[in-house]
UniProtKB/Swiss-Prot annotation:
Residues 512-525 have a biased composition (Polar residues). GO terms for molecular function: miRNA binding; mRNA 3'-UTR binding. The modification Phosphoserine is found at S19, S75, S98, S106, S124, S159, S197, S209, S229, S305, S710, S715, S807, S823. This is Pumilio homolog 1. SMART domains: Pumilio. The modification Omega-N-methylarginine is found at R797. The modification Phosphothreonine is found at T112, T515. Pumilio repeats lie at residues 849-884, 885-920, 921-958, 959-994, 995-1030, 1031-1066, 1067-1102, 1106-1145.
């Protein structure tokens, strides 16, 4: 059943291929001009209407076949469907059944779930493409802004079969447009059932509007309408030939639950062979029904799923599992790539999407790349020469079918372009041309671009982070040019190595973006190409010899337009016509004699030690894992030519001329290999083959603290000597103190010195899932895309992925706890042990394991907490181990923001001898420690936990003699003096009492001194406190009204002798009304009423009741005052019963007036409480009837 519907005023044909009332008639010819849109909803039980081609479908597993689909019954609820898809009843469907259903290509795409009358006119494909493109752009903008970081590409358990449509019942696992955030977007009267999937178990009311919470509506349109991608089931056979229509039915019967991946499914995958399943329409490599749920449309917002499991099982080696899965694929003949005109893989122009859908095993049947016959692939897929070779035979395959398809499409759509064919094409995607020295860097290279012919430049190169751009200065261009002069037959002449041999990283034409002139090595038949490349390299080298560096430039000859189509026309697009300069001129890139050395290296490569494809490490071909001595006859002093390493310095040697990719200049013989360090086993060629910028192991034999290795591990491929540099650890970004991004194209930022991390991030694709079209951004190897924005890697720093390049579970770089020296110092200043501990790599670390690092841990925030917790329950031996390390530097820890807590713990939990030993370390520094923020805490702990009868305590206290007042007025020292008064015997504190003579009033009004006065009154002997109290009584009136002195007077009233209290009360009498209205003195009056004797209390209360303040009594004035009302309340509380009755009778006449004042209400509340408590009739105290107070 098909009908033309309107979605947001975009017309489209909706065809239902799953209605139980329909059957398909194959006699109708297919019309390629009309897209067929299938939905996954089950057809409602509607009344069948008479039609010539109406019948029952074969079943839910029926696959759509070419033919027409007749008219079916209406849905059970027209209103709800019409709300979204309004039918234009005036239009007619031309041709009846033939016009309605004969639009089937190799496979139907999207059905609708509603059986609408096929009585409307369909639109042409051009119109639909135009409308959907506009809708896709709108939906893309909406999706980029609104979709949070959800796990999008994942189906639920109910996804049994059926193609995936754009209007899906439950497209995402977690709804990105949840009803809680966008409740107004929920369609009216449409019930959404979250548990339902987007297949035949959906119903009519699961049809969604463009504003419903399924999210990604426009996103789906872009991916399923605009792209005629082979991402459908036609790719399940692995080849590019036309797919059989009946194979879809077989695949549907074998579809499995896509929620999780358990053990028995691994066996099913092996039986399936090369059948490729898909998740939401995207093919998955080698038949693995993997969750590609880690893709996030918000960069860097990638979340791990709780049920995300290792595809290969918990106990299986990751590489072995991959090897088993890859081995199930048979080799595909070249003929499978013949019919590609109707298929393409356009790249989304608005989003960086690395496409890794295809992995094929070209084991032995592929035509060699360097053969004189047709060049079929970008890489050599002979089984003996693989990109990685591991003991468990993990074959990491790089596939070039997607690029071949682009060239095929370009040749088909642009027949005027010569030299492009599906089987023979220019292998290098772009040309890097070295402009002659002294010329304009932005116009040089145009001739090379015109001469070298069309090459593909994906337009994403101008939108990704600098790590996706390959500077020409990373590689030695003379070596590439010289290698081009050698015959490609020489490269193939050596015997093939056996399976267990270390295989070869190719630096020739099989690489995607490589050096400026390495495209020669597979194309010796093109003299123009060879001549242009050699000339440009020689000009570059001559300019360097003359001291005039040239500019490496990027001369694009082709690009992908915004729809993903390949356009081979140099300079046709704005912004791409002129060469793009990649790196600033670098006079230290290449030596003038590099070409001669490379010629000899290439000549010797036929008789090399590793399968004949690499003789010395200087040549354009490099064997993995071989670390050979490199005799260099062309060494030059560094005063003539500095180090040619791209990131590094030449501070170690006078004759260093190392051209390693990421290394310092070394004191070893120089080397001119293509971007390799002197003994590195993985270099720029691997980074280029993986589509990345820097999976390169740098020169790891030379020692310098100002650089770090980018890949460090203990596998056989990456051996490091004992004098190697300090590695990072498990992860690329290992420390919070690192800057996340060194800068554009690896250049250090102005604030980063030579010791800063300058190694680029890992490759765009790590081992196991690489494609030459992976242009979108960084991935961690398991298909999870991560953002290259600074700081975005934080959430992946501790995440463990099954095949991540730097994961502890990775088999390529296996982790080892003690694979490094513990004395290694990180650029942050911390040792690697502490750095790993801070990154939670050692959750069960013990005190004995940090021996030698106690001081460092003690001065770290997390390390100090670790030691504190361990010391509380540590054994005596463990405490002694820690104590031995901290004793010699105890003072340093005492004044440290974190170390002082470790010293305090020893005063709490250490042995008596340890406490005394630390106290001896304090002696001589008591004053300085007492005035220091952290040292004062240590002294207080020592005074508290060391018995006061110890001589060391008395000696410590005596050090403050002569500095008492200075300490008392200090914000830190006053705490030490207070602790001394509290913990030390009073006889030893007489010097403090003597220091206070004549200073009591001044100290009592001091914010810190008032505290010390109170401690003296609490703990000192009476004969010591007597002179202090005498001075206090002389200044009672002033102290009562002082913001600090009133606390001293209150303290005397609370804890002093009765005679001292009476003296203070005598000072208050006669001034109760005035002092009660004072902010500070009112507190003293309250204490007088509370702590005075009964007689004195009665005198104070009577004074308030009998005194008049103008026309009113003093009581009335006090009840209205913001401070004095508290004095009245206290009087009511503490007064004798008879006196309380007098007070209440005095208050009663003023009740009506008190209701007007905020503080008067407090008095009324107190009266109500009293009357209710005693059962007295409230009388007029109750509020008026209108409730106004």
């Amino acid at each position: 059943m098909s009908v033309a519907c309107v979605l947001k005023r975009k017309a489209v044909l909706w065809q239902d291929s799953f209605s139980p009332h329909l059957k398909h008639h194959p006699q109708e010819p297919a019309n390629p001009n009309m897209p067929v849109v299938l939905t996954s909803g089950t057809g409602s039980q509607a009344q069948p209407q008479p039609a010539a081609n109406q019948a029952l479908a074969a079943g839910t597993h029926s696959s759509p076949v070419p033919g027409s689909i007749g008219v079916a019954g209406r849905s059970q609820d027209d209103a709800m469907v019409d709300y979204f898809f309004q039918r234009q009843h005036g239009e007619q469907l031309g041709g009846g059944g033939s016009g309605g259903g004969g639009y089937n290509t190799s496979k139907h795409r999207w059905p609708t779930g509603d059986n609408i009358h096929a009585e409307h006119q369909v639109r042409s494909m051009d119109e639909l493409n135009h409308d959907f493109q506009a809708l896709a752009l709108e939906g893309r903008a909406m999706g980029e802004q609104l979709l949070p970081g959800k796990k999008f590409w994942e189906t639920d358990e109910s996804s049994k079969d059926g193609p995936k449509g754009i209007f899906l019942g439950d497209q995402w696992r977690d709804s990105a447009w949840g009803t809680s955030d966008h409740s107004v977007s929920q369609p009216i009267m449409v019930q959404r059932r979250p548990g339902q999937s987007f297949h035949v178990n959906s119903e009519v009311n699961s049809v969604l509007s463009p504003r419903s919470e399924s999210g990604g509506l426009g996103v789906s349109m872009v991916e399923y309408v605009l792209s005629s991608s082979p991402g459908d089931s036609c790719l399940r056979k692995g080849g590019f030939g036309p797919r059989d229509a009946d194979s879809d039915e077989n695949d549907k019967g074998e579809k499995k639950n896509k929620g999780t991946f358990d053990g028995d499914k691994l066996g099913d995958l092996k039986e399936e062979g090369d059948v490729m399943d898909k998740t939401n329409g995207l093919p998955v490599q080698n038949g693995i029904d993997a969750d590609v749920k880690d893709f996030s449309r918000t960069p860097g917002n990638c979340q791990n799923s709780a049920n995300e499991v290792d595809l290969l099982g918990p106990n299986q080696n990751g590489s072995e599992g991959l090897a088993q899965l890859t081995s199930t694929n048979g080799a595909k003949p070249v003929e499978d790539f013949s019919n590609m005109e109707s298929q393409s893989v356009p790249l989304d122009p608005m989003e960086h999407v690395g496409m890794e859908p295809l992995q094929f095993d070209y084991s032995g049947t592929q035509v060699p790349v360097d053969s004189a016959a047709a060049t079929v692939g970008l890489f050599d897929y002979n089984s003996q020469q693989q990109l990685f070779q591991r003991p468990n035979a993990l074959a990491v395959q790089q596939l070039t079918a997607a690029q071949q398809q682009q060239y095929a499409l370009a040749a088909a759509h642009q027949p005027h372009i010569a030299g492009l064919a599906p089987a023979a094409f220019v292998p290098n995607p772009y040309i890097i041309s070295a402009a002659p020295p002294g010329t304009d860097p932005y116009t040089a290279g145009l001739a090379a671009a015109a001469t070298l012919g069309p090459a593909v430049v994906p337009h994403q190169y101008y939108g990704v982070t600098p790590w996706g751009v390959y500077p020409a200065s990373l590689f030695q261009q003379q070596a590439a040019a010289a290698a081009a002069a050698t015959n490609s037959a020489t490269q193939q002449s050596a015997p093939q190595a056996q399976q267990g041999q270390q295989q070869v990283l190719r630096g020739g034409a099989s690489q995607r973006p490589l050096t400026p002139n390495q495209n020669q090595q597979g194309q010796q038949t093109d003299p123009l190409v060879a001549a242009a490349a050699v000339n440009s390299a020689l000009a570059f080298g001559q300019g360097l010899a003359a001291g005039m560096p040239g500019y490496p430039v990027l001369a694009p000859a082709a690009y992908y337009d915004q729809t993903g189509a390949l356009v081979v026309n140099a300079g046709a697009r704005n912004g791409l016509g002129a060469p793009v300069r990649l790196v600033a001129p670098a006079p230290v890139i290449i030596s003038s004699s590099a070409a001669q050395a490379a010629v000899a290296a290439a000549a010797a490569s036929a008789n090399g030690a590793a399968g004949g494809l690499a003789g010395t490490t200087n040549g354009p071909f490099r064997p993995l894992g071989t670390q050979q001595p490199q005799p260099q006859p062309q060494q030059q002093p560094s005063n003539n030519l500095a180090s040619s390493s791209f990131y590094g310095n030449n501070s170690l040697s006078s004759n260093s001329q190392s051209s390693s990719l990421f290394s310092q200049g070394s004191a070893q013989p120089a080397n001119t290999s293509l971007g390799f360090g002197s003994s590195s086993s993985l270099g720029a060629t691997l980074g280029s083959a993986l589509g990345g910028f820097g999976t390169a192991v740098a020169n790891s034999n030379t020692g310098s603290g100002s650089r770090r290795d980018s890949l460090t591990g203990s596998s056989d491929l990456y051996k490091r000597t004992s004098s190697s540099l300090a590695p990072i650890g498990h992860s690329f970004y290992s420390s919070l103190s690192y800057s996340s991004s060194p800068g554009p194209v690896g250049m250090p930022l102005p604030s980063q010195g030579p010791g800063h991390s300058q190694t680029p991030p890992p490759s765009l694709s790590s081992h196991g899932s690489s494609s030459s079209l992976n242009l979108g951004g960084l991935t961690n190897g398991s298909g999870r895309y991560i953002s290259a924005a600074p700081g975005a890697e934080a959430k992946y720093r501790s995440a463990s992925s099954a095949s991540s390049l730097f994961s502890p579970s990775s088999t390529l770089f296996s982790s080892s706890r003690l694979r490094y020296g513990m004395s290694d110092v990180m650029p942050s200043g911390r040792s690697r042990l502490l750095e790993d501990f801070r990154n939670n790599r050692y959750p069960n670390l013990q005190l004995r394991e940090i021996a030698g690092h106690i001081m460092e841990f003690s001065q770290d925030q997390h390390g100090s907490r670790f030691i504190q917790l361990k010391l509380e329950r540590a054994t005596a031996a463990e405490r002694q181990l820690v104590f031995n390390e901290i004793l010699q530097a105890a003072y340093q820890l005492m004044v440290d923001v974190f170390g002082n807590y470790v010293i305090q713990k020893f005063f709490e939990f250490g042995s008596h001898e340890q406490k005394l030993a630390l106290a001896e370390r304090i002696r001589g520094h008591v004053l300085s420690l007492a005035l220091q923020m952290y040292g004062c805490r240590v002294i207080q702990k020592a005074l508290e936990f060391i018995p006061s009868d110890q001589q060391v305590i008395n000696e410590m206290v005596r050090e403050l003699d002569g500095h008492v007042l200075k300490c008392v007025k200090d914000q830190n020292g006053n705490h030490v003096v207070q602790k001394c008064i509290e913990c030390v015997q009073p006889q030893s504190l007489q010097f403090i009492i003597d220091a206070f003579k004549g200073q009591v009033f001044a100290l009592s009004t001091h914010p810190y001194g008032c505290r010390v006065i109170q401690r003296i009154l609490e703990h000192c002997l009476p004969d010591q406190t007597l002179p202090i109290l005498e001075e206090l009584h002389q200044h009672t009136e002033q102290l009562v009204q002082d913001q600090y002195g009133n606390y001293v007077i209150q303290h005397v009233l609370e804890h002093g002798r009765p005679e001292d209290k009476s003296k203070i009360v005598a000072e208050i009498r006669g001034n109760v009304l005035v002092l009660s209205q004072h902010k500070f003195a009112s507190n003293v009056v309250e204490k007088c009423v509370t702590h005075a004797s009964r007689t004195e209390r009665a005198v104070l209360i009577d004074e308030v009741c009998t005194m008049n303040d103008g026309p009113h009594s003093a009581l009335y004035t006090m009840m209205k005052d913001q401070y004095a009302n508290y004095v009245v309340q206290k009087m009511i509380d503490v007064a004798e019963p008879g006196q309380r009755k007098i007070v209440m009778h005095k208050i009663r006449p003023h009740i009506a007036t008190l209701r007007k004042y905020t503080y008067g209400k407090h008095i009324l509340a107190k009266l109500e409480k009293y009357y209710m408590k005693n059962g007295v009739d409230l009388g007029p105290i109750c509020g008026p009837p209108n409730g106004i107070i």
